[in-house]
Amino acid sequence: MTEATRILLGVNIDHVATLRQARGTRYPDPVKAALDAEEAGADGITVHLREDRRHIQERDVRMLKEVLQTRMNFEMGVTEEMLAFAEEIRPAHSCLVPERREELTTEGGLDVAGQEQRIRDAVRRLAAVGSEVSLFIDPDPRQIEASARVGAPAIELHTGRYADAENPGEQARELQRVREGVALGRSLGLIVNAGHGLHYHNVEPVAAIEGINELNIGHAIVAHALFVGFRQAVAEMKALMLAAAAKR
């Protein structure tokens, strides 16, 4: 595998916790899912500690920090509460995301261009505790350029519009937006990741884009795991990604 064909899989385990929280039980354990994902080939584990604590809890994050063999990618809103928690936990990676209580899932990218100083301050605080920061943004040149200006070393391009496209033409246009976003981000010296809405039937065109470092995928893997088991679900996704990246 060359640098050009290398691609990483970050497995988001939020929805293992969603199932647990639905009944207020101690199972299924997202930490167990994370360890299984690592054994199946995951390159990192992503968790989003939301303001309303609808799935992942602080205890999960603390336990993951202690036991992961790979690395944690801590998704968080840009709030004082979350920044203080991240400074305590010191995750290897942090991803700043927009957040609204009423949304089912993150609906769009962070408006970096509209709040550059606020994001710059957050990036500096996280970097000071050794956390590599990425910004979850739409594949919009204005947002990508702003991300570079505020000092973030990485971005994660929101692939939701590609994933939700209702016809092949729309999907092709959205995929091209992602391609152009990757190229612009790389030209500005950014590490470029991507994610949101990716599943077993749409991941390959994104994984085949030259310059993408990592894909973060959760819901599709957790759903598929109901039928094949968590390790198998992770292994199948990683295999699809590697096969697509090999064709770059």
From Swiss-Prot:
Residues annotated as the enzyme's active site: 48 (proton acceptor), 75 (proton acceptor), 196 (proton donor)
One GO BP: pyridoxine biosynthetic process
Keywords noted in UniProt: Cytoplasm, Pyridoxine biosynthesis, Transferase
Site (Transition state stabilizer): 156
Binding site for 3-amino-2-oxopropyl phosphate: 12, 23, 197, 218-219
Gene3D superfamilies xrefs: Aldolase class I
Top-rank taxon, per record: Bacteria
The keyword Protease belongs to this UniProt entry's keyword annotation: no
Associated pathway: Cofactor biosynthesis; pyridoxine 5'-phosphate biosynthesis; pyridoxine 5'-phosphate from D-erythrose 4-phosphate: step 5/5
Positions annotated to bind 1-deoxy-D-xylulose 5-phosphate: 14-15, 50, 55, 105
Record-linked Pfam families: PdxJ (PF03740)
Record field: catalytic activity: 3-amino-2-oxopropyl phosphate + 1-deoxy-D-xylulose 5-phosphate = pyridoxine 5'-phosphate + phosphate + 2 H2O + H(+)
GO cellular component annotations of the record: cytosol
Main localization category: cytoplasm
This protein's record includes keyword Transferase: yes
Single GO term (MF): pyridoxine 5'-phosphate synthase activity
NCBIfam families given in the database record: pdxJ (TIGR00559), PRK05265.1-1 (NF003623), PRK05265.1-3 (NF003625), PRK05265.1-5 (NF003627)
Homology family: Belongs to the PNP synthase family.
Protein role: Catalyzes the complicated ring closure reaction between the two acyclic compounds 1-deoxy-D-xylulose-5-phosphate (DXP) and 3-amino-2-oxopropyl phosphate (1-amino-acetone-3-phosphate or AAP) to form pyridoxine 5'-phosphate (PNP) and inorganic phosphate.
Subunit: Homooctamer; tetramer of dimers.
Protein name, UniProt field: Pyridoxine 5'-phosphate synthase
Gene: pdxJ
